[in-house]
Amino acid sequence: MAIILGVDPGSRITGYGVIQCQGRHQIYLGSGCIRTSSEELPGRLKQIFDGITEIIRQYQPDEFAIERVFMAKNADSALKLGQARGAAIVAATVANLPVAEYSATQIKSAVVGTGRAQKAQVQHMIQQLLKLPAAPQADAADALGVAVCHYHTSQSLIALSGRATARTYGRYR
């Protein structure tokens, strides 16, 4: 029964989503957004670090997954996004959580089935997968998508490793 914290980083709004995995089922535990104030970037990064630290304290996750930086048209935006990711990753590392990273395409593929899915499609599928009464806000849905992607990816790796170890002299046991 692993608890996974997924994070969709941003310098102004950082989404988070927490799920518990029981066998093939994913159970929604919580989600939301860390909204930083309009102060300078170092202060916003501290708010992200403190916010993720509090979420880790509250939910006690076993694993941490975060969306990778994509190449934005604006280099300054990409740098700020990278710094926001760094603040979240440091919070996870301080809590001794293993950190996994996924691209937006990987996340959308795991949740919707196509890497080119729109935000509304991700929100809808997260609502369906986690049996939520309403679609979560976009940043929280993206973070829940990161957690779901991590769960599916880790399950696939476990299945593959099981097959690899069951093989003896070119035959399956």
UniProtKB/Swiss-Prot annotation:
GO terms for molecular function: crossover junction DNA endonuclease activity; DNA binding; magnesium ion binding. GO terms for biological process: DNA recombination; DNA repair. The keyword Metal-binding applies. Mg(2+) 2 binds at residue 67. Its EC number is 3.1.21.10. Keywords: Cytoplasm, DNA damage, DNA recombination, DNA repair, DNA-binding, Endonuclease, Hydrolase, Magnesium, Metal-binding, Nuclease. Its cofactor is Mg(2+). Mg(2+) 1 binds at residues 8, 139. The active site is at residues 8, 67, 139. Its main location: cytoplasm. It catalyses: Endonucleolytic cleavage at a junction such as a reciprocal single-stranded crossover between two homologous DNA duplexes (Holliday junction). Pfam families: RuvC. One of its GO terms (cellular component) is Holliday junction resolvase complex. Binds 2 Mg(2+) ion per subunit. It is found in: Cytoplasm. InterPro entries: RNaseH-like_sf, RNaseH_sf, X-over_junc_endoDNase_Mg_BS, X-over_junc_endoDNase_RuvC. It is an enzyme of class 3 (hydrolase). Belongs to the RuvC family. Homodimer which binds Holliday junction (HJ) DNA. The HJ becomes 2-fold symmetrical on binding to RuvC with unstacked arms; it has a different conformation from HJ DNA in complex with RuvA. In the full resolvosome a probable DNA-RuvA(4)-RuvB(12)-RuvC(2) complex forms which resolves the HJ. The RuvA-RuvB-RuvC complex processes Holliday junction (HJ) DNA during genetic recombination and DNA repair. Endonuclease that resolves HJ intermediates. Cleaves cruciform DNA by making single-stranded nicks across the HJ at symmetrical positions within the homologous arms, yielding a 5'-phosphate and a 3'-hydroxyl group; requires a central core of homology in the junction. The consensus cleavage sequence is 5'-(A/T)TT(C/G)-3'. Cleavage occurs on the 3'-side of the TT dinucleotide at the point of strand exchange. This is Crossover junction endodeoxyribonuclease RuvC. It comes from Shewanella baltica (strain OS155 / ATCC BAA-1091). The lineage of its organism: Bacteria, Pseudomonadati, Pseudomonadota, Gammaproteobacteria, Alteromonadales.
